[in-house]
């Protein structure tokens, strides 16, 4: 974890993390509206972007970083607002943190619907951002005991899968099939 981000995390309550992936160079409005919504709820915010020049001036309760390790960061977040890419979604699930997905393209809308169906969060159309609706969705997700419970359960399930053992067993079976 970058030292300055670590200091920010230690200095207060769990933040809302906003990230839209590494390819979002023209998402200033999306970053600004999501940060405003979280700040309006009295939440601290971490914005991850490689293009900080697209952001408005943010208050001290917001931290902007070019990069952070998602797993360790997400496990310390109250909510992750993101684009719905499968890698980001998986890291948030593993961290046991609720999610609000803003799906733009590709597999992101499907990932958003699956996430909602499993009770791990919700989604919002990034092309129809409204501060009031974002605030309401964030508040509902943050206040939901059902979502928190589902996120904790899914994270626990991921920890207990021992994927490396399953992969090794599958490879052994495959190799044994070739030698038979």
Regions found by a protein language model. Give the residues of each.
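A donor-sugar binding/catalytic signature common to diverse glycosyltransferases
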Residues: 65-114
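Short hydrophobic alpha-helical runs that function as membrane-insertion/retention elements
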Residues: 45-47, 100-101, 122-124
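C-terminal amphipathic helix plus adjacent low-complexity
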Residues: 131-180
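Donor-nucleotide binding loops and adjacent catalytic segments primarily
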Residues: 1-79
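Acidic, glycine-centered active-site loop in nucleotide-sugar glycosyltransferases
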Residues: 60, 95-96, 116-121
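Flexible loop/turn segments at secondary-structure boundaries
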Residues: 24-27, 53-56, 88-89, 107-109, ...
């Amino acid at each position: 974890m970058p030292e300055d981000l670590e200091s920010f995390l230690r200095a207060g309550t769990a933040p809302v993390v906003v990230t839209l992936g590494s390819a979002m160079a023209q998402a200033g409005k999306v970053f600004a509206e999501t940060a405003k919504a979280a700040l309006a709820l009295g939440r601290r915010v971490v914005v991850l972007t490689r293009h900080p020049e697209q952001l408005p001036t943010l208050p001290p309760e917001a931290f902007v970083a070019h990069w952070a390790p998602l797993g360790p960061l997400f496990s310390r977040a109250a909510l992750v607002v993101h684009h719905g890419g499968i890698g980001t979604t998986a890291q948030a699930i593993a961290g046991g943190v609720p999610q609000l997905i803003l799906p733009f393209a590709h597999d992101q809308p499907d990932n958003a619907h699956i996430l909602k169906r499993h009770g791990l969060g919700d989604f919002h159309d990034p092309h129809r951002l409204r501060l009031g609706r974002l605030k309401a969705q964030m508040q509902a997700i943050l206040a939901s005991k059902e979502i928190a419970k589902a996120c904790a359960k899914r994270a626990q399930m991921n920890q207990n899968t021992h994927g490396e053992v399953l992969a090794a067993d599958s490879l052994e079976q495959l190799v044994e099939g070739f030698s038979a």
